[in-house]
UniProtKB/Swiss-Prot annotation:
Motif annotated as PXDLS motif, CTBP-binding, chain positions: 240-244
Segments forming unnamed zinc fingers: 150-170
Entry GO MF terms: zinc ion binding
Region (Interaction with UBE2I): 74-136
Disordered: region residues: 102-122
Keywords: Activator, Early protein, G1/S host cell cycle checkpoint dysregulation by virus, Host nucleus, Host-virus interaction, Inhibition of host innate immune response by virus, Inhibition of host interferon signaling pathway by virus, Inhibition of host STAT1 by virus, Interferon antiviral system evasion, Metal-binding, Modulation of host cell cycle by virus, Modulation of host E3 ubiquitin ligases by virus, Modulation of host ubiquitin pathway by virus, Oncogene, Transcription, Transcription regulation, Viral immunoevasion, Zinc, Zinc-finger
Protein name: Early E1A protein
Organism for this UniProt entry: Human adenovirus F serotype 41
Primary location recorded for the protein, binned into one broad class: host cell
Length: 251
């Protein structure tokens, strides 16, 4: 440690402060406010004294011909005067941007599809008009096929907007939810003032089956019968059982 100089044995703060004080910053000159743009022309000494010969004269003349220098000078003068000189010979022309090209004629299949589509639209519109006209009235109907051609179903479909809607009667007939039997004709089919009697509804149940009747028990044997129905009939010879008498002994 004795061999080291005092500069390295001091405190690091003192050493850093000494380094900062020892440095001298470079004083750069401030740039001029009016900085001139340097072009490629300024890199070559084009204008020389006639007495001195320039070895690069031919190369410079080949790189910058006289016509290029004259155009550059005219552009600089035009920009300085405020007239660029561009667009002086332009004339206002009205352009028609409409396309007059005709497309290919439609094929036969496309024409048929267009006609079918138009017919479907017409039928849909007519159906909508018919539904709209009869939307204010609800008429009960009973078609052969439930849900098809029913005026009540059309009313519900037009009012709800659901094409699969059905009236309650067609729904019950289609699903067999209840036993259905027509009571009267559909509205509109029978004329007013007719004296014809309406048909009575068909019977909902078949003929009741014959049930056996209870018979009194007797000790006497019954005679032979030809069929089981004979057993269900009352035997006129049967007498009521007298409970006051003693039961006969069986041999």
């Amino acid at each position: 440690m004795r061999m080291l100089p005092d500069f390295f044995t001091g405190n690091w703060d003192d050493m850093f402060q000494g380094l900062l004080e020892a440095e001298h910053p470079f004083d750069f000159p401030e740039p001029s406010q009016a900085f001139e743009e340097i072009s490629l022309h300024n890199l070559f000494d084009v204008e020389l004294d006639e007495s001195e010969g320039d070895p690069n004269e031919e190369a410079v003349d080949g790189m910058f011909p006289n016509w290029m220098l004259s155009e550059d000078h005219s552009a600089d003068s035009g920009a300085a005067s405020g007239d660029s000189g561009v667009g002086e010979d332009l004339v206002e022309v009205n352009l028609d941007l409409k396309c007059y090209e005709e497309g290919l004629p439609p094929s036969g299949s496309e024409a048929d599809e267009a006609e079918e589509r138009a017919e479907e639209e017409e039928t849909a519109v007519s159906n909508y008009v018919n539904i709209a006209e009869g939307a204010s009235q609800l008429v009960l109907d009973c078609p052969e096929n439930p849900g098809r051609g029913c005026r009540a179903c059309d009313f519900h479909r037009g009012s709800s907007g659901n094409p699969e809607a059905m009236c309650a009667l067609c729904y019950m007939r289609l699903t067999g939810h209840c036993i259905y039997s027509p009571i009267s004709d559909a509205e509109g089919e029978c004329e007013l003032g007719s004296n014809e009697e309406t048909e009575l509804p068909c019977s909902l149940t078949a003929t009741a089956p014959v049930r056996p009747t209870p018979c009194r028990v007797s000790c006497r044997r019954r005679p032979a019968v030809d069929c089981i129905e004979d057993l269900l009939e009352e035997d006129p010879t049967d007498e009521p059982l007298n409970l006051s008498l003693k039961r006969p002994k069986s041999s």
